[in-house]
């Protein structure tokens, strides 16, 4: 076998695969060609149909254009009328003249059917003929007033009239408002003393005063009853000597002694009765009349009912403190004041009066020698003795050597100095409560103190009330009558007023005419026609 034959055998083995691929490709191309041809035919048919419809529409439009509007309207109306007539005939009840039934039916005729529904409303009919003219109506109402005319020209001024008679004085005008405050006038004369003021309230309780000086010794008291002998007290400590005793009776004038010390001031005497009031002084001379004030304004201002406040001027500056006044007269006895606050505890008072003698106790044992008793009462005046030094020595010798019987208790001496507190004694029986003493007289008024320092400026006071209206001033002189003024221009026409209230209904008019009256050129009946 040669090489050519092998090549031919190899080519025959590969042909079946290549043939299948070419056949599939050819079939696909054929399907696409058939689809495209069908689509072209479908589009051509649709385009032909659309073209025919457009041609028909154009032809119909041309026919309508050539037929004109009246023919088209008549054709449209004819079709609608036929349709409406057909609907109307269908709604009308149909009467059967001959019974439409087969010959073999022997049934009686049935009842007539019910009435049908009303048909549609028909088209409006043609307008009727115009009637004859009516009778003329009654007279109309008055027309509205016309617009105001233009302003007239200015008239010529009239002649001056005769001079009028002198008029009477007019009524005095109302009081004018208060004028400005005038200058401060000279100080007036001293006025009369005013009436005595009412009793003032009781003043506050004064502070306790300083201890006064020792007063003079009082008169000797009555002889006291002998007291109960007390227990022996402890020996006291040496203290300052006591105050001198009361002076004895006046003796014979002795030799001129040295000058004594100044005496103690006495207790102030009682307040004297108030004096009679003095006689009123004579009235001073009348001052010169002031200058005539200016004419006040006649405008009345109410000031909200506070005229007194309106007349008051603004408060002036604070004045300097005045000189101290004269001490006033003593007032009447005031009412007893309220009980004051309890004061501080005072110093220990003097020893009280001796109590009543108790029952006699058993005789005690002889005690030791007691203290020397108080000096006895003054004896009768003796004769003029010898010199004071010798008499004093003999008196002392008698007292020491020959002790006499104890004399009656003398008057209580002045309070001694504060001694050392002794042991606490036994409480005595409680005495009865004494009656309250009478109220002492009021002391004399003290001297007037020096004027105090100027106080701080006070706060601004409230607004004063308006003052009362002043008295009517004297009417001024009547002025001369002025010249007659020229006639003023004519005023403009006023604005028309509002529409008035509707009037009552008028009475019925006369009966109308049986036949028409001729009408004049103004549209109204000829005068005299309706009187016939």
UniProtKB/Swiss-Prot annotation:
GO terms for cellular component: cell surface; collagen trimer; collagen-containing extracellular matrix; extracellular region; extracellular space; plasma membrane. It is found in: Cell membrane. Residues 342-354, 380-393, 427-441, 478-495 have a biased composition (Basic and acidic residues). GO terms for molecular function: heparin binding; identical protein binding. Keywords: Cell membrane, Collagen, Membrane, Repeat, Signal-anchor, Transmembrane, Transmembrane helix. Signal peptide: none annotated. Residues 102-296, 308-532 are annotated as: Disordered. Residues 129-145, 196-207 have a biased composition (Low complexity). The chain crosses the membrane at residues 24-45. Undergoes proteolytic cleavage by furin protease to yield a 60 kDa soluble form that forms a homotrimer and exhibits a low affinity interaction with heparin. The keyword Iron does not apply. InterPro entries: Collagen (IPR008160), Collagen_Structural_Proteins (IPR050938). Residues 108-166, 173-232, 240-298, 313-372, 404-452, 455-514 form the Collagen-like domain. It is a single-pass type II membrane protein. Residues 46-532 are extracellular. Residues 174-184, 314-326, 403-414 have a biased composition (Pro residues). Residues 1-23 are cytoplasmic. Homotrimer. This is Collagen alpha-1(XXIII) chain. The gene is Col23a1.
């Amino acid at each position: 076998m040669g090489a050519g034959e092998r090549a031919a055998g190899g080519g025959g083995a590969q042909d079946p695969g290549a043939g299948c691929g070419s056949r599939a490709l050819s079939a696909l191309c054929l399907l696409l060609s058939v689809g495209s041809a069908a689509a072209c035919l479908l589009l051509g048919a649709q385009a032909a149909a659309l073209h025919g419809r457009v041609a028909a529409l154009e032809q119909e439009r041309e026919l309508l254009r050539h037929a004109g509007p009246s023919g088209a309207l008549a054709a449209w109306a004819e079709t609608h009328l036929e349709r409406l007539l057909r609907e109307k005939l269908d709604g009308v009840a149909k009467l059967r003249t001959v019974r439409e039934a087969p010959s073999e039916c022997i049934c009686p005729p049935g009842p007539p059917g019910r009435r049908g529904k009303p048909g549609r409303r028909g088209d409006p009919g043609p307008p009727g003929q115009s009637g004859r003219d009516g009778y003329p109506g009654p007279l109309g109402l008055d027309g509205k007033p016309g617009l105001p005319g233009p302003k007239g020209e200015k008239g010529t001024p009239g002649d001056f009239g005769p001079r009028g008679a002198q008029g009477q004085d007019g009524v005095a005008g109302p009081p004018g408002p208060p004028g400005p405050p005038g200058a401060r006038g000279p100080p007036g004369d001293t006025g009369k003393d005013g009436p005595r003021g009412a009793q003032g309230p009781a003043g506050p309780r004064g502070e306790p005063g300083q201890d006064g000086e020792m007063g003079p010794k009082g008169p000797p008291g009555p002889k006291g009853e002998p007291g109960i002998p007390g227990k022996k007290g402890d020996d006291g400590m040496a203290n300052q000597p006591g105050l001198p005793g009361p002076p004895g009776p006046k003796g014979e004038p002795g030799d001129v002694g040295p000058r004594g010390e100044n005496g103690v001031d006495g207790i102030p005497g009682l307040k004297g009765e108030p004096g009679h009031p003095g006689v009123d002084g004579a009235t001073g001379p009348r001052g010169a009349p002031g200058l005539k004030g200016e004419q006040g304004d006649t405008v009345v201002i109410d000031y909200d009912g506070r005229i007194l406040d309106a007349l008051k001027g603004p408060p002036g500056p604070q004045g300097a403190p005045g000189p101290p006044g004269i001490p006033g007269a003593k007032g009447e006895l005031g009412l007893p004041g309220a009980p004051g606050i309890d004061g501080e505890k005072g110093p220990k008072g003097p020893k009280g009066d001796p109590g009543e003698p108790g029952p006699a106790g058993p005789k005690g044992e002889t005690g030791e020698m007691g203290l020397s008793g108080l000096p006895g009462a003054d004896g009768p005046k003796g004769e003029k003795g010898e010199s004071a030094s010798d008499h004093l020595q003999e008196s002392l010798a008698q007292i020491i050597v020959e002790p006499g019987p104890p004399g009656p208790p003398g008057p209580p001496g002045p309070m001694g100095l504060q001694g050392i507190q002794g042991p606490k004694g036994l409480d005595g029986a409680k005495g009865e409560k004494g009656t309250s003493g009478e109220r002492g007289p009021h002391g004399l008024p003290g001297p007037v103190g020096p004027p105090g320092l100027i106080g701080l400026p006070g706060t601004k006071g409230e607004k004063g009330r308006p003052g009362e209206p002043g008295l009517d001033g004297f009417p001024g002189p009547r002025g001369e009558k002025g010249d007659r003024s020229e006639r003023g221009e004519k005023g403009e026409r006023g604005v028309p007023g509002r529409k008035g209230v509707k009037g009552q209904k008028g009475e019925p008019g006369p009966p109308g005419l049986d036949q028409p009256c001729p009408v004049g050129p103004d549209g109204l009946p000829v005068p005299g026609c309706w009187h016939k």
